[in-house]
């Protein structure tokens, strides 16, 4: 029985106000990301100061983090799609190298990527 094979991919983490959650998830759908995870009501401190979670209020009033694992060739279209949002509103995107064992769950990279 052989071991698992790992395949290089990119992990995207986008932190935005909850009111922009749909913008980000629709963009991920548009670029054919195979899926994403949303973590709501997050707290933290950044360029615009301290952001506190609002567990008792609307999720649109708090920060959310949307995470996805995609082939490297999808990073630039995601960044391009987020550019108009980040020009008007606060938010941040992190990109990390990751390795996945089930590449078929995340989409394959195209040749040359």
Protein language model regions, located:
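Positively charged, small/polar-rich N-terminal and surface patches that mediate targeting and assembly
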Residues: 1-113
């Amino acid at each position: 029985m052989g071991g698992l094979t790992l395949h290089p991919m990119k992990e995207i983490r986008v932190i935005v106000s909850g009111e922009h959650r749909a913008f980000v998830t629709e963009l991920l759908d548009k670029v054919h990301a195979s899926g994403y995870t949303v973590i709501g009501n997050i707290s933290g401190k950044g360029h615009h100061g301290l952001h506190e979670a609002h567990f008792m209020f609307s999720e649109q009033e708090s920060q959310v983090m949307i995470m996805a694992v995609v082939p490297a060739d999808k990073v630039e279209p995601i960044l391009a799609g987020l550019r108009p949002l980040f020009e008007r509103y606060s938010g941040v995107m992190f990109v990390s190298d990751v390795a996945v064992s089930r590449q078929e769950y995340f989409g394959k990279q195209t040749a040359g990527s």
